[in-house]
């Protein structure tokens, strides 16, 4: 059996920088969460076609791992035969609709595992470019940096050298639909975009930035949109917590 861990991420900050061709561009600090991850295992057996277990509630063709498999079929022509003798089993720990990148992380880790088992015929850059066709966050998980500045549509991933923070996460029993949160932002908040307000943030270490700004609304442009889209979030006592991605997870630095 072959296994790989697919780690969650948080967004230390997330700022929308524009809107092009129907998609929002951004600047964000992604930080890997080392103690929260899904585990993907390739289990030997005999199967008629690609088989995926452990992702309940998501139809196969909509699953990010399956999309990654499809994206890899051309550069890995023997992959279809390989998955007639192996199935994919996912042990899920990352909650969905939580702003932690679980589906994207699964796709990125799966791609890294397949590339590694094939003696890495694709460069990490090439693998990340393939990943960008699956989802905006996938390239970050392909590179698997502990911390990185992510720009554009998510395809520009620049490692940021810093000591990773020890984080405490709080994920309420509230799912935030990423597409709806972005739609709310676009409709009501895009006009408030001000790149000067976050000038130089990408050069600051995450701990300093969280201490200096200390305001989840200022740090994450999607937070107000998430509050509007998921009003149950407003009923939570989240003083001292920051907001990751489109939600619904909050995080803070451990004492």
UniProtKB/Swiss-Prot annotation:
Keywords: ATP-binding, Isoprene biosynthesis, Kinase, Nucleotide-binding, Transferase. GO terms for biological process: isopentenyl diphosphate biosynthetic process, methylerythritol 4-phosphate pathway; terpenoid biosynthetic process. SUPFAM superfamilies: GHMP Kinase, C-terminal domain, Ribosomal protein S5 domain 2-like. GO terms for molecular function: 4-(cytidine 5'-diphospho)-2-C-methyl-D-erythritol kinase activity; ATP binding. ATP binds at residues 95-105. The active site is at residues 9, 137. Its EC number is 2.7.1.148. The keyword Cytoplasm does not apply. Catalyzes the phosphorylation of the position 2 hydroxy group of 4-diphosphocytidyl-2C-methyl-D-erythritol. Belongs to the GHMP kinase family. IspE subfamily. HAMAP family: IspE (MF_00061). This is 4-diphosphocytidyl-2-C-methyl-D-erythritol kinase. It comes from Sulfurovum sp. (strain NBC37-1). The gene is ispE.
């Amino acid at each position: 059996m072959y296994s790989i861990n697919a780690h969650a991420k948080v967004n230390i900050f997330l700022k929308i920088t524009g809107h092009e061709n129907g998609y929002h561009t951004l600047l964000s600090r992604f930080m890997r969460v080392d103690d929260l991850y899904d585990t993907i295992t390739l289990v030997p057996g005999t199967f008629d076609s690609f088989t995926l277990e452990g992702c309940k509630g998501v139809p196969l063709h909509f699953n990010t791992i399956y999309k990654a498999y499809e994206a890899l079929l051309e550069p890995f022509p023997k992959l279809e035969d390989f998955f007639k003798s192996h199935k994919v089993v996912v042990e899920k720990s990352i909650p969905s609709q939580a702003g932690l990148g679980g589906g994207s992380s699964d796709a990125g880790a799966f791609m890294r595992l397949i590339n590694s088992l094939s003696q890495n015929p694709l460069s990490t850059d090439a693998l990340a470019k393939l990943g960008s066709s699956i989802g905006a966050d996938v390239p970050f998980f392909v590179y698997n940096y502990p911390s990185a500045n992510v720009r554009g549509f998510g395809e520009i991933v620049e490692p940021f050298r810093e000591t990773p923070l020890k984080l405490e996460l709080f994920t309420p029993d509230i799912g935030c639909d990423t597409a709806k949160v972005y739609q709310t932002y676009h409709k009501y908040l895009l006009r408030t975009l001000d790149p000067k307000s976050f000038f130089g943030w990408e050069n600051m270490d995450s701990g300093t930035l969280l201490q200096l700004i200390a305001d989840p609304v200022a740090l994450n442009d999607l937070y107000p949109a998430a509050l509007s889209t998921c009003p149950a979030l407003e009923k939570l006592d989240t003083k001292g917590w920051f907001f990751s991605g489109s939600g619904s997870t909050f995080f803070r630095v451990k004492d």
